[in-house]
């Protein structure tokens, strides 16, 4: 086990929008180390969002992430011979990471032609409270609510 917690590295703001969130999204979209391709996808999707809404795409993205971020999640806790799903609050950094992960995961499962279209539409859906990534958050909250009886097994 690690002696100390690994230090958090500062996130470099992206050159186009000057936003840390966009940098994190680029890194989540990244596959096989092809960063320029990931940047092209993210910037293309954000341009499409701006085209469709006329609003600053970073604000749209942040609104979408706000709708995806979970407040609670369940973690497995072994007590005696039984494993309980214990609801715990999600730290802000983890909530952000989960939101980005779910956004990209469900973007990849969409049926539009290009990744740019998929990402743009998933961001717009999430910003409007629709889409698979928002449903995932609701499911996570339902799980936590269903297992509320085990909340006293907290860490």
From Swiss-Prot:
- Keyword set includes Ribosomal protein: yes
Query: In Gene Ontology terms, what is one molecular function of this protein?
Result: structural constituent of ribosome
**Taxonomy, superkingdom:** Bacteria
The cysteines joined by S-S bonds are none
Give a single Pfam family match.
Ribosomal_S7
HAMAP family given in the database record: Ribosomal_uS7_B
Output this protein's name: Small ribosomal subunit protein uS7
Q: Which organism is it from?
A: Corynebacterium diphtheriae (strain ATCC 700971 / NCTC 13129 / Biotype gravis)
């Amino acid at each position: 086990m690690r002696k100390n917690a690994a230090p958090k590295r500062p996130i470099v703001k992206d050159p186009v929008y000057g936003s840390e969130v966009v940098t994190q999204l680029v890194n989540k979209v990244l596959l096989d180390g092809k960063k320029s391709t990931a940047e092209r996808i993210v910037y293309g999707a954000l341009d499409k969002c701006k085209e469709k809404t006329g609003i600053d795409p970073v604000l749209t993205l942040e609104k979408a992430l706000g709708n995806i971020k979970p407040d609670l999640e369940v973690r497995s806790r072994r007590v005696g011979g039984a494993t309980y799903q214990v609801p715990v609050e999600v730290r802000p950094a983890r909530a952000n990471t989960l939101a980005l992960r779910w956004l990209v995961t469900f973007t990849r499962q969409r049926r539009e032609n290009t990744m740019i279209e998929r990402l743009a539409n998933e961001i717009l859906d999430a910003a409007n409270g629709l889409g698979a990534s928002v449903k995932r958050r609701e499911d996570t909250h339902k799980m936590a609510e269903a297992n509320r009886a085990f909340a006293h097994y907290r860490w």
